[in-house]
């Protein structure tokens, strides 16, 4: 086993875990780490490399499941709802939020993969996503109607789902677009973040599962240690990142992440253009 290649797998998993759920664009970071430094997945071959990227994303998804496990058990009816008759987030809220991007993603998947995954489009997505986040913070309602995820209405869920369609453009960031959208339609930053992460699990798991089925046959036994290392690294760092982000979001809001995204866009611009 090549320990340097194993370290590359761990580093890529770390980058995926730290950035997948933060509103900073995991795609933008993977461009820098993968293309400019590691050339990380060359040792796996093209098709196994695609599978590796899916596997480390599954590590991030598992971290979100762990953080929100009680909520998912409740949504699926495995655990009973809290008494008191207060409004609660339902599975229907999640489905409504997923529909717009889910439908567009299925219809335009091939076009997006073939025409939108480039350094230039990611650069554009980083900047436009940052501007959306700045606008969201600027016009955020001081007294948000939905202070917690359980106070989100079906209308708000649908509107957030519409804004999530922007994340189909690489670099825009799923969490960045949906949290900004949630804030703009009257959610607190924490409520929007909770709803974003809960919605992300089924849509990411579905997309990753399909991709895994398409590419798994290209993986060899020798690749397995790298997949395990990347998966575990992504899981651990995503777990830390999600908990840290949720703890901070109501206090620091979105502008610091927007500034970071613009700085990242400048770095990519000067490195590539």
Swiss-Prot record:
One Gene Ontology MF term: undecaprenyl-diphosphatase activity
Disulfide-bonded cysteines: none
Any one biological process term the GO annotation gives: cell wall organization
Catalytic activity as recorded in UniProt: di-trans,octa-cis-undecaprenyl diphosphate + H2O = di-trans,octa-cis-undecaprenyl phosphate + phosphate + H(+)
Localization, UniProt: Cell membrane
Stretches that traverse the bilayer: 48-68, 89-109, 116-136, 152-172, 193-213, 222-242, 252-272
This protein's UniProt keywords: Antibiotic resistance, Cell membrane, Cell shape, Cell wall biogenesis/degradation, Hydrolase, Membrane, Peptidoglycan synthesis, Transmembrane, Transmembrane helix
EC number: 3.6.1.27
Broadest EC class assigned to this enzyme: hydrolase
Comment field (misc): Bacitracin is thought to be involved in the inhibition of peptidoglycan synthesis by sequestering undecaprenyl diphosphate, thereby reducing the pool of lipid carrier available.
Protein's UniProt name: Undecaprenyl-diphosphatase
């Amino acid at each position: 086993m090549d320990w340097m290649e194993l370290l590359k797998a761990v580093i890529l998993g770390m980058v995926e875990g730290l950035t997948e759920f933060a509103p900073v664009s995991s795609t933008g970071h993977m461009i820098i780490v993968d293309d400019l430094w590691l050339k990380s997945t060359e040792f796996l071959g093209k098709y196994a490399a695609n599978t590796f990227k899916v596997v480390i994303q599954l590590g991030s998804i598992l971290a979100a499941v762990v953080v929100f496990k009680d909520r998912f058990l409740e949504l699926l009816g495995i655990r009973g709802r809290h008494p008191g008759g207060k409004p609660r987030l339902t599975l229907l809220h999640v489905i409504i939020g997923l529909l717009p991007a889910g439908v567009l993603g299925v219809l335009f998947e091939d076009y997006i993969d073939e025409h939108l995954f480039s350094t230039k489009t990611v650069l554009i997505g980083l900047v436009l996503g940052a501007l959306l986040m700045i606008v969201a913070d600027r016009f955020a309602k001081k007294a948000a109607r939905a202070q917690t995820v359980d106070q989100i209405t079906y209308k708000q869920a649908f509107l957030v789902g519409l804004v999530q369609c922007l994340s189909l453009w690489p670099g825009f960031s799923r969490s960045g677009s949906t949290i900004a959208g949630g804030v703009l339609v009257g959610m607190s930053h924490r409520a929007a973040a909770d709803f974003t992460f809960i919605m992300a699990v089924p849509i990411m798991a579905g997309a990753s599962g399909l991709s895994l089925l398409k590419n798994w046959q290209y993986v060899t036994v020798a690749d397995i240690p790298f997949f395990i290392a990347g998966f575990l690294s992504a899981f651990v760092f995503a777990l830390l990142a999600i908990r840290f982000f949720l703890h901070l979001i109501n206090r620091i809001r979105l502008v610091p992440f927007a500034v970071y995204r613009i700085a990242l866009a400048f770095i990519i611009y000067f490195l590539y253009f």
